[in-house]
């Protein structure tokens, strides 16, 4: 069985317990890692006039999104920043942005869907089964591309990184 199928099967099987196990095995450090990564997602870079100062309208691809904790954290931060944008007179149609979650495991995404629904973020977060080696998105479709914990599971890291760079808008950033 190819690595991709093994990974998919493993995560489908552990999906119901994944969040609890992740917190236990990392001694809750995973929460700190997410906060640090979130800071990097919104850190502005020189030459990004396409994004408002607060990151309004940002399009983020979260690869290996799992049960969606990081995608949800990104969307919640977008909502907070959108409120500030509105106070500064930013066009509301540019706020707050969108997160697309991608994962091999339909079991993980099923749990993500329940979380997204419970948080009322269905309009801001979409998610789909997919493989980072063959992204269906157009060149330059995203302002940010991120992978929280999934790089270790990529079958072909080089192919995934090439695809991540392809779908990243020129001048934007990827993070892990």
Where are these regions (language model features)?
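Hydrophobic beta-strand segment of the Class I
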Residues: 18, 145-146
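Class I SAM-dependent methyltransferase SAM/SAH-binding core
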Residues: 58-134
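A short acidic, Gly/Pro-enriched loop at the edge of an enzyme's catalytic core
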Residues: 133-145
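Conserved alpha-helix/loop element of class I SAM-dependent methyltransferases that forms part
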Residues: 28-58, 73, 77
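Short catalytic micro-motifs in class I SAM-dependent methyltransferases
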Residues: 149-150
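A short glycine-rich, Lys/Arg-flanked "PGG" loop and its adjoining helix->strand segment in the class I
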Residues: 158-173
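N-terminal, positively charged/glycine-rich alpha-helical extensions of SAM-dependent methyltransferases
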Residues: 1-19
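Class I SAM-dependent methyltransferase Rossmann-like catalytic core
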Residues: 15-29
